[in-house]
A protein has these predicted regions:
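Glycine/Thr-rich beta-alpha phosphate-binding loop at enzyme active sites
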Residues: 53-64, 69-90, 170-200, 273, ...
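C-terminal helical cap(s) of enzyme catalytic domains, especially alpha/beta-barrels
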Residues: 192-202, 234-252, 288-297, 339-340, ...
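An N-cap/entry alpha-helix motif that binds or orients negatively charged groups
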Residues: 1-64
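Short beta-strand/loop segments at the ligand-binding rim of alpha/beta enzyme cores
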Residues: 45-47, 101-111, 149-158, 201-211, ...
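Glycine-rich phosphate-binding active-site loops on the catalytic face of alpha/beta enzymes
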Residues: 122-142, 179-189, 225-247, 271-283, ...
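N-terminal small/glycine-rich loop or linker at the start of catalytic domains
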Residues: 39-60, 93-100, 144, 203, ...
Length: 453
């Protein structure tokens, strides 16, 4: 029985033969002007996000994909973009790559099954800055010839390998960028240990990209790679924006939003949620009218933060501002919480617990729990508690707040909480977000490591 790869390659050779016969040539090809490898060589974790409508392992993933909408998100959050151009098995087309060149500023990888040097030239003609060469599909001579032609066009080459022998072959061809595919191309199974096993054999000056099987941000922690190529888990998600942000940065709520400009900046940089405080004594408080204007003008998910407000008043504000979540500070008894739960259809509930009552949060019936150093009130005091106290607890639905800022955000994330909640640590003054601090936060979370001194 032939493997999936064998079937794809047989069909690809037929397609290329047809393409060559009908082609009038590509004329004088302009060299690539976007440095694919350099984008992945930046410190910390880097991300190649993929345009993919289907795959042999999953069938149709997102057949109704709107390329312009997806690429607008990738332009904000990807380091590079991979475009699958195989039509029969992956639902793509060469036209997708050409359109991506027009719509996207990021370096572009043409991901297809290269069987002829003609495809390298076609790739540059379509706008690719790099091509994928699969070691399992090519002989040594083809690997050398195809990569040489790509480099003549100042394109980078991502050499894809699955085992030690393939890795040896591509290194002999001078590979400086290696993609380790965690998927077995014979039976389509996934083994994330493939990256760990092969990475140890790479020279220090060769960049490593981990491919396939990356579904959650936690998967990144165990993969010793410089960059990650992710497609299916994003495209299979109902909420593309949220999935991309949670993979690249982890879930983050930016709270205490008072201005539309701050809200827009937070969303563009990577915030999963925006938090609006309805508590007049606080300098971060907003009126219902202010919040409604921002919430209805911008995309993204919004959370209302309430301090001892009447439950019916909370419900009214939720509907007026189209909120996605409600966060309760203060003294809400179990009856008030149940009252809100039964009436908040499609709106999640966050119950707040102080460090003083750490032992009781696991009994909460709310969708999420928020842990803060502040004993009562609306938070935003810039104080933290000893996060070591969280060890051994189930934190899968927990937001961590209090004293989190760009310099300690990775430490906070490393506690294993579901999400981070930041407010004063991102401000130039109460209620005013500092764009430099916002950018520093998401840069740090994206890289996943402390900057070297």
């Amino acid at each position: 029985m032939s493997s999936v790869l064998d079937r794809i390659l047989a069909r690809k050779r037929e397609e290329v033969a047809e393409g060559r016969r009908s082609s009038e040539g590509f004329g004088d090809l302009e060299p690539s002007d976007r440095d694919f490898r350099a984008a992945l060589a930046a410190p910390g974790r880097r991300f190649i996000l993929e345009v993919k409508k289907a795959s042999p392992s999953r069938g149709a993933i997102r057949p109704d994909l709107v390329l312009e909408e997806l690429l607008a998100l990738y332009d904000l959050h990807a380091d590079c973009v991979s475009v699958l151009t195989d039509e029969e098995f992956f639902g793509g087309s060469p036209g997708d790559l050409k359109e991506a060149r027009r719509l996207c500023r990021r370096p572009l990888l043409r991901k297809d099954f290269m069987v002829d040097v003609w495809q390298i030239e076609e790739s540059r003609h379509l706008g690719a800055d790099a091509v994928l060469l699969i070691a399992a599909a090519l002989g040594d001579g083809e690997l050398r010839d195809f990569s040489a032609r790509a480099r003549e066009l100042e394109m980078d080459v991502l050499f894809e390998v699955h085992d030690e022998e393939e890795l040896r072959r591509v290194l002999d061809c001078g590979a400086d960028l290696v993609g380790i595919n965690n998927r077995n191309l014979v039976d389509l199974s996934i083994d994330l240990q493939t990256t760990s096993r092969l990475r140890s054999l790479l020279p220090d000056d060769v960049l490593c990209v981990s491919e396939s099987g990356i579904n959650e941000r936690n998967d990144l922690q165990s993969l010793p790679a410089d960059a990650f190529l992710i497609g299916s888990s994003i495209l299979a998600s109902e909420d593309l924006d949220r999935k991309i942000k949670e993979l690249v940065y982890g879930p983050v709520k930016v709270c205490g939003i008072t201005r539309r400009a701050d809200a827009q900046a937070a969303l563009d940089l990577g915030a999963t949620w925006l938090g609006f405080l309805f508590h007049p004594p606080s300098p971060r408080s907003v009126t219902v009218e202010q919040a409604r204007e921002i919430c209805r003008a911008l995309p993204g998910r919004k959370v209302g933060v309430f301090v001892d407000q009447n439950p019916d008043e909370i419900l009214s504000i939720v509907h007026q501002c189209d909120l996605h979540g409600v966060q309760l500070h203060g003294n809400y008894d179990s009856e008030a919480v149940r009252y809100l739960e039964t009436r908040l259809q499609g709106v999640f509930l966050v119950e707040v617990f102080s460090a003083e009552s750490l032992g009781s949060f696991e009994e909460s019936r709310a969708d999420y729990q928020l842990l803060d150093a502040a004993p009562q009130g609306e938070g935003g005091l810039g104080e933290s508690f000893d996060w070591a106290r969280l060890q051994g607890r189930d934190l899968s639905t927990v937001f961590l707040a209090g004293g989190i800022h760009p310099a300690n955000a990775l430490e906070a994330q490393a506690t294993g909480v579901y999400a981070l909640d930041l407010s004063s640590g991102l401000e130039s003054e109460p209620g005013i977000k500092d764009p430099t601090r916002l950018a520093a936060l998401f840069d740090k979370l994206r890289a996943g490591q402390e900057e070297s001194s």
